[in-house]
Amino acid sequence: HDATGDVADSIVAAKSAFPGDVTDCYRELLEPVLAAFEAAGADVGFADAGAPALWEPLCYLRALDPAHDLVGPDGRKVAGNAQYRTREAVVQHGSLTFESDPEAHLAPFVDPPIGPGAFAERVGGVSESPGVDPDRSAFVDRLESALVEWAGAEAGAWTDAERERAAELCDRKYAADRWVEGRDDPT
């Protein structure tokens, strides 16, 4: 991922609050993301049809899936999403391209089978849409506002006690041999 061209979002929610059907769940969890695109003036929606993967190591180049991939009017992917489900929770992570930089995405790989041109044919940036404010931080603010409104959340910050507790959990979990060797959570 590109540190400045990409924007990431994550939603963690009670599984019982959302549809059991994965596609329906994606549609509901992506409502605030689509609202942010709309607020920015970007014409973005779910892909109408799938497309084969161009190259698996890069998430933007994996197969285009109408269940969870968002595209611009030209059909290029602007956002991809993935879900992880436990017995009690749904964790959804999304990556969206605000400003596409094919060279930056491909740079970490030695001799990728896809060049910048093929990347640009599959992936588009939100900022490329006519009428969209090219200010990334303004878009991030719109996305944050849409997520807060959708979730009925209150903006806030971590307390010192919460940060200390999180650090303790990280230390206990990730320093444990049973986690490192077998992904057995000791917490």
Predicted regions and their residues:
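Long, positively charged amphipathic alpha-helical accessory segments at protein N-termini or as interdomain linkers
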Residues: L34-L54, T86-T187
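Short connector loops at helix/strand junctions that flank enzyme active sites
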Residues: D2-D6, D65, V91
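Hydrophobic alpha-helical segments that drive targeting, anchoring, or assembly
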Residues: H1, V22, H93-L96
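Long, well-ordered alpha-helical scaffolding segments within enzyme catalytic domains
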Residues: T23-A39
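Short loop segments at secondary-structure junctions
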Residues: A14-S16, D74-G75, S100-P102
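A glycine-rich, hydrophobic loop/mini-helix early in the fold
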Residues: H1-G20
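Aromatic/basic-lined ligand-recognition segments
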Residues: Y60-R87, H93
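Flexible, glycine/proline-enriched loop segments at strand-loop-helix junctions
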Residues: S16-D24, E128-P134
